[in-house]
């Protein structure tokens, strides 16, 4: 190989290395690479919530429901109809809220966007609080959790930063605050899913107890944002919930409220 040919090969090698380095620098600036995928984007809502609530010192029902501390608040666990937020004379259900200043501006925007979808598709309007006694206080404490339904006073919706500030997770916790249970605890769930009790971690079997629910004449919804994922509270990630009759049916949600979730809000609040 003559000198000119060797120089040409060397130049091609240098150009190739330069392009590769440029690609790597661009990936570093963007904070990701082609091989890297945010694992949380692949998780269903319940998996994200349980991961964020892991090691919580607070006793939680069904993984993310804060147990009421007053007799008045207990009513929602016995009679869901009695824990609805009050409706205005114009048919709008106004839910006052405050968002902690400990969130960044983009996190606040994500929260408000999740709330906005309720106003677009239901009669639920989350409105900034003035001086109302009953309101939601969204705070970045440990985990993702909420109380169940209308309490009549300040009630905290916990949305930890760097994990819970996701459209679907926010809507999940807001639905709890509006009075909705997890889908797999429906009174008719045994017709639609099989609970694999032997695969559930011993201390968490109570999270799969059925509730005496009013299903509002709506079908069981595998795609509900309130549905547990297949391996929720499973030993070594074993399957704890199996759809029937089709065991391969997709369950869980990763993006937003399903159409049936929205239908139920409209039915419960007579929108």
UniProtKB/Swiss-Prot annotation:
Disulfide bonds join 76-83, 123-271, 144-164. InterPro entries: MetalloPept_cat_dom_sf, Peptidase_M12A, Peptidase_Metallo, ZnMP_hatching_enz. Binds 1 zinc ion per subunit. CDD domains: ZnMc_hatching_enzyme (cd04283). Residues 21-71 form a propeptide. Its main location: other. Its cofactor is Zn(2+). This is Low choriolytic enzyme. It comes from Oryzias latipes. The gene is lce.
